[in-house]
Amino acid sequence: MVLAAFGGKMAVMQPLPYKIAQSVLVVIYTDQAQVLLVQRTQGDGRGAAFWQSVTGSKDFESEPWEQVAAREVFEETGIDVYGEGCRLQDWELENIYPIYPQWLHRYAPGACMNTERVFGLQVPSYVHVTLNPREHTAFAWHAWRDAADRCYAPSNAEAILHLPAFLSA
């Protein structure tokens, strides 16, 4: 059993034996359209490490999308989405894609598609990043187009390419 608090709300969560095929992708960016990418510790199944935005699955079926986004950003980067100068926004975009074969064993039998909800997190340029060493080995800030080009997952690149529409929002 896990007790978690995000955004002033407490929740008791019972860990599930399998990952839930519902996840978030959070594009973290500055007002100058610099995008944060993190490098995964484990490779793509062929041994190659890859770059991505913050991602993560729901811990329980009814977990609200915003809570998942806040939890994953904090776990992976140490950034508090409710901190000074930060603005978390649900971009109301969803990607549905096949789960990569090398990761199917993490999901319940029969699960083959993942639904990914896209969020943006605007942060101040001085934000401090503290990586979780179990998940990531490096981070880097890139201009948004360059960041999109560096992403392993096509859905991640596509999400970053939507950034200009949200910069003025």
Predicted feature locations:
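N-terminal strand-loop-strand
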Residues: A11-V54
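C-terminal alpha-helix
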Residues: H162-A169
